[in-house]
Amino acid sequence: MRTIVSGKRSLLIPFLIIIIALTVLTALPLSARQSKSAKPAASAQTASARNAQAASPGAKSDPSQVGSWTAPVNLGVITIHAALLHTGKILAWWYPQGTNVNSPAKLYDTVTGKTKDVTVPFPGDFFCSGHTILADGRVLVTGGLLGNPHPGVPDDGITATAIFDPGSETWSQGTPMNLARWYPTDVELPSGQTLTLTGKNEHAVIDLPMEQYDPATEVWTLLPSSANIPQQSSDTYLKMKLLTNGKVFMAGSNADTYTFDPATNRWTLTATMNFGNRYHGAAVILPGLTKVFTAGGTANHAGGGATATAEVIDLAAPAPQWSFVSPMHIPRYNSNLVILADGTLLEVGGAQTERYGTPVLIPELYDPSTDTWTEMMTQTDSRPYHSTALLLPDGTVWSAGSDDPTKKIAGHSYEIFSPPYLSKGARPTITSAPSAITYNQKFTVTTPDAASVTKVALVRPGSTTHDNDFDQRYVVLDVRHGTGKLSVTAPPSANYAPPGCTCSCW
C-alpha cells in the first residue's frame, strides 16, 4: 500500500489502484439479461430454500464461476463497524460489554491474518456511530449511544467523537459535535472536510440540522437552517453519495431522494423511488460516478418483508428518474453491497424476515453492464443485521459480524470471499507506479502486461456499518497503452476523488 501526502486540495487520494487485464474479465452476453421487474418477482425464492439448494451435492462449486470462501475465523469482536486503513489493516469495533464503558476494538492485518487489541482507552459507547476516513488516513468516528437505564425508553445519542491513527495504532478523543447523534451519516467533501448529518439526539429525536468538521482546525460548525434535512426524508444512516459536481445525493432510505449543495446549503428534490420507502437497503454510486444503484431493503421501517427489487438513477440525465433493473434472486435487507475490483457489485449477507430471521447465506454478483445477477458460493456463517463487508487490497472481500443473539460465536467470526475474477488467470504485474499523484496529472505505470490491460481504476477503501458504506468509491481512469507501460490520467478534481491516502491493488 502507498500513502499519499495530503493537506492541499490538489493532492490525491484515499483509493486502491486497480489494473484489470483481459484474462481476468468475462461478461455474460446481452441475451443472458434478466427481464426488468417492478416487483420482487415471483421467482425470487426464500432464503431458506435457496440456502438449502446451494448446500446440496449438486450445487455449483467452480471458483471461476461462483467464487470461494475461507473457513470462518474468530476475530474476538463482533464487527458491527469496520474501516479499511491505508496500512492494509481493518479497524473493527462494537459496543461495550457488561459494566465496561470502553468500546472493544481490534486491528486485523489483511496480509498476515494477525490481530491486535486496540480497545478505545477512554469511556464512550461508539456503537451505531458514523465514521469516515480523513484525508490524512485517520478514521473519524462520530456519535454513538448514551444508553438509557429505563426500560421502554428510547436510547439517546452522544456528542462525543474519536479519532484512530493508523500510524501509531492509537485512539484519541476528538472535538465533540454541536449535537448528539446516534446512527449518523458521515461523508467526506471535496474540501477534505466531513459533512455529518442525521442521527438521534439526546432526546432520541432525529437531528435535522447538519454540521461540518474541519480536520485542519478540529472545529465543528453547525450549518444554517436552510441545510436542515428535509422533514419528509428524516431517517438514520442516510445513504449519501458525493457527485462529480460537488453536490451530495441522498439515496434513501425514504422514497423521496434529494440532492444537497454544500455551496448554497440547500436541498433539492431530485426524484422518487418506484419501490417507495426502501428502509435498510444498500446503495452505491456506480463506477461512472453519474448513476446511483440501490437494492434490497423493506417498506417496513421496523424490518421484515424484504424486497428483491433494485433501482438505478442517472443523475447526469436532464430529468433524473429512478428505474427498476433486474431484481435479485433472493429478497434481503440489512445486507452489504460491495464494489468489487472489476466494477461489479457483490450483495452479501442480510435477512428476509425480522432483523435476524431467515438469514441469506448466498451472495449475489451484479453486473451493471449486463443487468444480471449471479448467485455465488454459499458462506458458512450468517450475516444479517449488524454485519459488515469490505473490498480488500488483494481483490478479496471481508465479510464479518452480526450480533444475532442466537449465534454469538458466529458473530465474532470473519470470512474471506474470493470473487470469480481471481480464478480466471494471472494478475498483471506492476513494475513501478508513482507514490503520489495530483488531480488531472498524467502518470506512468510500468508493467510487462500493458497490452492486456483493459481498465485502470481508483477504488476508495470502505468504511461501513448497518448496510451503509460511507466511503467506497470506484473511479475509472483514462488510460493509453504503450510498450511495457501505461499512461494514465488522474481524476480531474476532488469532486471525483476526495483527497487522502491510497493503496495499490492488482
Locations of the language-model features?
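N-terminal secretory signal peptides that target proteins for export/translocation
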Residues: M1-R9
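Serine/threonine-biased, Pro/acidic-interspersed low-complexity stretches characteristic
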Residues: V5, P14, P29-A32
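Enrichment for repetitive, rod-forming helical segments
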Residues: R9, F15-L16, S43-T46
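Bacterial N-terminal signal peptides
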Residues: P14-L25
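Kelch-like beta-propeller repeat domains
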Residues: P29, R33-W506
